[in-house]
Each structure stands twice: as C-alpha cells, then as structure tokens.
Amino acid sequence: MQEEEDLPPHINDPYVEDVDDGHEVESRETLTSIMPRVAGRVDVDKILTGISEGRVTCKQLTNFCAHFSFVSSVEPLKVQDALIDNDWLIAMQEELNSFEHNQVWSLVKRPTTEHNVIGTKWIFKNKQDENGVIIRNKARLVAQGYSQVEGLDFGETFAPVARLESIRILLAYAAFNGFTLHQMDVKSAFLNGPLQEEVYVSQPPGFVDLDHKDYVYKLHKALYGLKQAPRAWYDHLKKFLLDDGFVRGVIDPTLFTKRDKGDLILCQIYVDDIIFGSPNIHLCKKFAASMTKNFEMSLNADLKFFLGFQIQQFQEGIFLSQAKYLKDILAKFGMSDASPCKTPMPTKTVLTEDSNGIPFDPSKYRSMIGSLLYLCASRPDIMFSVCMCARFQASPRESHHKAVKHILRYLVHTPKLGLWYPKDAKFDLIGYTDADWAGDKVDRKSTSGAC
C-alpha cells in the first residue's frame, strides 16, 4: 500500500519531454487514435423539423455531431425530455446511426406467428473521465429483456468477464517488464454479435416510422438488454482474436496472448473494454490497427481509468487507486465531512448478532457493504473489517452500522491510499495464509485468510 503523494514526480507521458527536475525525458512512441473529420455546416432547426416530420436525417446529424463540442450535464428521465434537448437528441441519433452502420436490424411487418415482440427503452447516461468531468452524453437503446421467453427468444446466455485479480496481475506484470498498457473501448459492442435466434423488437420511442407504425424490427445482431447479448458479443470477439493468432487462457478465458517472433502481446477483455500491452510498441500498433479495421473503436494513448480504477503508469512502476470511487462512496452515505480515524477497526473488536439492539435499514446496510467490498480491490487494508461487518447483512443492528461508519471514517483519513507495483520488485508468485482457532464468539468458527 502506498500514498499517492509518495509516487514518482512525473508520469511517463509520451507527449512531455521536459519535467520539473530539469532532466530531459526521452520521447517514446505511443498509440494514437485518428478521428475522421467531417466538413460542412448544418442548420439545427432543419434537422429538428426533419425528425418531427419523420424524415431520415442521419447524414445531417452526423455532420452536426462533428462540430458540436458541448455536452448536457442533466440526465433526462423521460424520452420526451431528451427529444427537446439538442445534446441528447444528437446522442440518440448517434445510437441509431450505429445500428444502421452495424446492420443490426430490418424494419418488417409484425409477425403473424407466435413470435414475441420485445419492447425497447432509452437509457441516458453522462460519461465521465477519471476526474469526474462529463465528456459525453450517451444514449443507449435497450431491449426489455425481462419479457423474453427462454427457448423461444434465447438459449445460452453465459459470458465470462475478467476477475479483478487477473487485472491486478496484468498490471504487476506490465510494471515488472516496463511496458505501457493501453485501453480500447468498442463502441456499441453488443451490436456486433450475430444472433442465432429469431428475435423481434418494437420501434424505438420517439423514432417511430410514420409510414409504417405497425411494423417491428427483426434483429440480425444482439441488442443491449437481450439476455443472450453478452454471450453473442463474447463469442464474436473470441473468434476474431483466435483467428488473429491469439491463444485463450486456460484459467482465465478473458485473457488472450499472442507470440510473434519472440515478442509477446497480452489482451485482457472485460465485455467491451480491452486492455492490451507489449514490450514491442509496433506489435501494439499492429493489433490496434486490426481492431480498428474490424470494429468501431475509441482508443486511449495509455490506460488511465478502468472499471472505477485510476491507473497511473510511471517509469518506476504502476499505481492503482480508487480515489474517485471512494469520494463517491463517502458522499453517498453522508460521510465526506466525518471526523477521521487512524484504523479501520479498533483492536479486539467483537461483533455479535446483537438481537436486542436497535434494527438498522437492511437495504442501506447492504449497499454500504457492497460498495466497500468493491473498494477492497485496491484497499486490502480494509478487507478484514468489511468482511466482519458483512456477516450481519441479514439482520443488521445499529452496532453493526457503527462499525461500518468507523471504516468509512478511516477512509476519510486515507483517501489516496492505493496499490503500488514497482518495476524493480520480484515477479514471483507467493502465497500467504493464516487462521485463528474458534475465535468467533457467535458460532465458534475459525477465521482464516489467504493472499
């Protein structure tokens, strides 16, 4: 564990050649994304009028999106609110444009057979960067998958995701070998996965074809919200990587590796987010070009923010923290201004069922425990305390709530603590385990731990 203030004075930034200490930093090659530029000016009023009259204006909106640099800070709750907001209207049309680009569906007559027509719904979300700044308005059209019928609308649904332990091991390996990790995001990833079943969905709210109001869309590829969508996307991406020469991991099916003339490239996937890296930058460029050719991608120069983790890559190692996530947790539970304490739990703390104690809201208690358990991914110092409090989620009492608040007060004291993977450390797999003997006062079970 290490504080952020104790990190090296400069980040290994490929675009910075001078640092404050006066030394010259050698510029290194890195991945960059080249975004297409669209010329021309667009009349917004004409676009809005065209949409209200049911005319197709995808091309005009595409041009307009290229020039519109502002985003809305308010997430609409209803489709009607989004349709009168230019920013969200553009985001909705971008989503439909991606449907057309990926050939996701076809407008057809409503089936007369016993096929199920699944409803659709708009979801609106502001996308933020690692500092919490809104950078994009994202509108997602999803299928109401809860109405799907097993055996009729879907079959296999399971799709693996990367374990957080695997991601941490990848970070440690990259730090040990001194190479930079990069991140890719596949835009509208599920829309790339071919469907095996015959599935129909209703027309999206606010974008109904006025000439064919009774028509529905027949899906050729998966739609967000469908139960089989994650599986369809994973199978499609897996096939692409295997055809490209990658080998899937035996223990972790989301880790793919490829050797090319003695060089190694690693690729870790988490649904539509992809982490990859190699000591050979040209191998990374080749892989990035291959992905961009086959999928619509957004590409970062290096890995900085992933699944709520803030990742800083230095020449001396890699620092992993969840400072932003922690800040959100403290604000959510009203503990931002709480008085700090120096330990996550007082020594010799004993928690019991406390059946005669004052009951506490179970939903809120479980929410607090769930939030803290995810924070443990970069804060092993609170793992024992959180797990002890997690035993009483079925019937929490005020005494248990007080113990959780003590953990939050400790986090107020250590907001920037995280995991540091130094380059000069040994990359050996070492296991530790320990246990007490019947130490639990409630059921006399032993407490064990391992890492």
Model-identified regions with their sequence ranges:
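Mobile genetic element proteins and their domesticated derivatives, centered on retroelements
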Residues: R41, I47-L48, V79, M92-E95, ...
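Conserved beta-strand/loop block within the catalytic cores
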Residues: I90-A162, R168, A189-L191, G249-Y270, ...
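Reverse-transcriptase-like RNA-dependent polymerase core
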Residues: D45-P76, K125-L152, V161, K187-Y217, ...
